[in-house]
Curated annotation (Swiss-Prot):
UniProt KW keywords: Cell membrane, Membrane, Transmembrane, Transmembrane helix
Subcellular location: Cell membrane
One GO CC term, this protein: plasma membrane
Main subcellular location: membrane
Pfam families: DUF624
Segments passing through the bilayer: 25-45, 80-100, 111-131, 160-180
Entry keyword Coiled coil: no
InterPro entries according to UniProt: DUF624 (IPR006938)
Protein name: Uncharacterized protein YteU
Membrane association type: Multi-pass membrane protein
Origin superkingdom: Bacteria
Organism: Bacillus subtilis (strain 168)
Length: 222
């Protein structure tokens, strides 16, 4: 029986390895299908949608069909959202590049922009999970991604640490990048953000100081 259990765990592990490799290749293909710049956002949204279904226990979901449906469905919305995020990122980068801290006030300004940049990066961790979980207007994804990244800072820092660790792993083993890069990172982020969303959905389980977050997400609870 112990042998059967070990074999079952090994088969399950191999199954997940194949899942990550397959979805990573799908992400690469659909990114190229959109000529790169127009494909990366809908391909990433489709990848997160598949990861979300797996995390919800839908193990038998048709991956290719789901990926293609999400890719088509999110093509314009995700690209518009991506354009907004890219603009914000470029503005932050230019500000940091142009501001040389020659005196005290510029030091303060540069530090403030760096904090804003950190918040922007933290917000990015939540954008795609929210995009595939809720059907909102574009501005709400930015708003609530920022809100969650601050309100659940411990989860945000966990995602940051995991992302840095995965980047070091991929840099050490570049041969696995085509198979286990974006898919692995997206699964980790989706699982953590999904746990955050479950906390938000809890009725009466949130601390009072965070109750306004649940009401913002689910106005019927007001």
């Amino acid at each position: 029986m112990e042998h059967d259990g070990s074999l079952g765990r090994m088969l399950r592990f191999c199954e997940w390895i194949m899942r990550f490799a397959y979805t990573n290749l799908l992400w690469l293909f659909f990114t190229l299908l959109g000529l790169g710049v127009f494909g990366i956002m809908p391909a990433t949204a489709a990848l997160f949608a598949v990861m979300r279904k797996w995390i919800q226990g839908q193990d038998n979901v048709p991956v290719l069909k789901t990926f293609w449906q999400e890719y088509k469905g999110e093509f314009f919305r995700s690209n518009l959202l991506g354009a907004v995020l890219a603009l914000i990122g470029v503005i932050i980068y230019i500000d940091l590049a142009l501001i040389y801290p020659s005196h005290f006030l510029l030091h303060i300004l540069r530090f403030a922009i760096m904090i804003f940049g950190f918040l922007f990066v933290s917000m990015l961790f939540y954008v795609f999970p929210l995009l595939v979980h809720f059907d909102w207007k574009k501005r709400l994804y930015v708003k609530f991604s920022l809100l969650l990244s601050v309100a659940y800072l411990q989860y945000t820092l966990t995602m940051l640490a995991l992302t840095v660790a995965l980047f070091f792993l991929l840099a050490y083993l570049p041969g696995i990048v085509p198979f286990f890069s974006v898919s692995l990172i997206s699964y980790c982020h989706m699982r953590i953000v999904y746990a955050v969303l479950l906390k938000v959905e809890q009725h009466g389980g949130e601390p009072q100081r965070k109750s306004h977050i649940r009401k913002a997400f689910y106005p019927e609870t007001r």
